[in-house]
C-alpha cells in the first residue's frame, strides 16, 4: 500500500516579468510527495528549482494551480494563514545556513519552537535531542562562527525540523561543502528524515547524493518529470 500523499502540486503556473517579456518558469507543473519519501530535484541553474520549492513551501503564490498540503488546499488562504501553515508544517534548509550569529547552536534550534509557543525548557530539551541526533550535541553552546561549515549545516537541519514539520524542503543543502563533508551531512539529514517519517524534496546538483534518494525528478519545459 502506497504511503499517504503529504504534498501535492496541481497544475502550478508561475511566470516573471523580465524587461518587456514574460518568462515562464512553471507551466502546469504537477508533483506529489508521500510521507517518508525523499525525492531529489535535479535540474540546471535557472530551470526553476528554487521557484518550485518556494511555491511548494508557500513562500510564493503561484499564478495558477494549487498547493495541497496534508489534504488542505492552500490557494485561497490569506497571507497570515499561509504563514501559520508554513511555520507549523514546512521546514526549510538552504545552501547557506542563515543561523543567527548572536545565538548558540542550541538557541538557534530553540527559537522556532518558542515562536510557536513552546516553553523555553521544553524547547531546550528538544533542541538538545536534535543536536545529539545530528552528532553535534557537544557543540550546543557554540555560536555559528565557532562551528565548521558541516556543523553549521547540521544545526540548520536540526532547526528546520524542530517543529516536527510534515515536509522538509531543501535547496542545495550541501552545495557549499566539500565532498566528504557533504556526504556526511547528507547522511545525517537522511537518517533524520527516515527516523521521523517526514517527506523531503531536496534540490541538488550532486548526482551521487541524488541516487541515494527514493526517486529523482527534473524540470523540463516548466513541468516536473521523472528521471
UniProtKB/Swiss-Prot annotation:
Major enzyme class: translocase
Keyword terms: ATP-binding, Cell inner membrane, Cell membrane, Membrane, Nucleotide-binding, Translocase, Transport
Keyword NADP: no
Protein topology in the membrane: Peripheral membrane protein
Positions with a binding annotation for ATP: 43-50
Documented EC number(s): 7.6.2.-
GO biological process, alphabetically ordered: lipoprotein localization to outer membrane; protein localization to outer membrane
Family annotation (PROSITE patterns): ABC_TRANSPORTER_1, ABC_TRANSPORTER_2, LOLD
Domain ABC transporter intervals: 7-227
A single cellular component GO annotation: plasma membrane
Cleavable signal peptide: none
Cellular localization per UniProt: Cell inner membrane
A Pfam family: ABC_tran
GO MF annotation terms: ATP binding; ATP hydrolysis activity; transmembrane transporter activity
Function: Part of the ABC transporter complex LolCDE involved in the translocation of mature outer membrane-directed lipoproteins, from the inner membrane to the periplasmic chaperone, LolA. Responsible for the formation of the LolA-lipoprotein complex in an ATP-dependent manner.
Assembly and binders: The complex is composed of two ATP-binding proteins (LolD) and two transmembrane proteins (LolC and LolE).
Recorded family membership: Belongs to the ABC transporter superfamily. Lipoprotein translocase (TC 3.A.1.125) family.
Protein known as: Lipoprotein-releasing system ATP-binding protein LolD
Organism: Brucella abortus (strain 2308)
Amino acid at each position: 500500500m502506497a504511503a499517504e500523499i503529504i504534498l501535492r502540486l496541481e497544475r502550478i503556473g508561475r511566470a516573471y516579468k523580465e524587461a518587456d517579456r514574460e518568462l515562464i518558469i512553471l507551466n502546469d507543473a504537477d508533483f506529489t510527495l508521500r510521507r517518508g519519501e525523499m525525492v531529489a530535484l535535479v535540474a540546471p541553474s535557472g530551470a526553476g528549482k528554487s521557484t518550485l520549492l518556494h511555491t511548494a513551501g508557500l513562500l510564493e503564490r503561484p499564478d495558477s494551480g494549487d498547493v495541497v498540503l496534508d489534504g488542505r488546499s492552500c490557494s485561497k488562504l490569506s497571507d497570515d494563514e499561509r504563514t501559520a501553515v508554513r511555520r507549523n508544517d514546512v521546514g526549510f534548509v538552504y545552501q547557506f545556513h542563515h543561523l543567527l550569529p548572536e545565538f548558540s547552536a542550541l538557541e538557534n534550534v530553540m527559537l522556532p519552537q518558542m515562536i510557536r509557543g513552546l516553553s523555553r525548557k521544553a524547547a531546550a530539551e528538544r533542541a538538545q535531542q536534535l543536536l545529539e541526533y545530528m552528532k553535534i550535541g557537544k557543540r550546543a553552546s557554540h555560536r555559528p562562527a565557532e562551528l565548521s561549515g558541516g556543523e553549521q549545516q547540521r544545526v540548520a537541519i536540526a532547526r528546520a525540523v524542530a517543529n516536527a514539520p510534515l515536509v522538509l524542503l531543501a535547496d542545495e543543502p550541501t552545495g557549499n561543502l566539500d565532498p566528504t563533508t557533504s556526504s556526511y551531512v547528507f547522511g545525517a539529514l537522511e537518517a533524520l528524515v527516515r527516523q521521523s517519517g517526514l517527506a523531503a524534496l531536496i534540490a541538488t546538483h550532486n548526482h551521487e547524493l541524488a541516487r541515494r534518494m527514493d526517486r529523482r525528478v527534473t524540470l523540463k519545459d516548466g513541468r516536473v518529470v521523472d528521471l
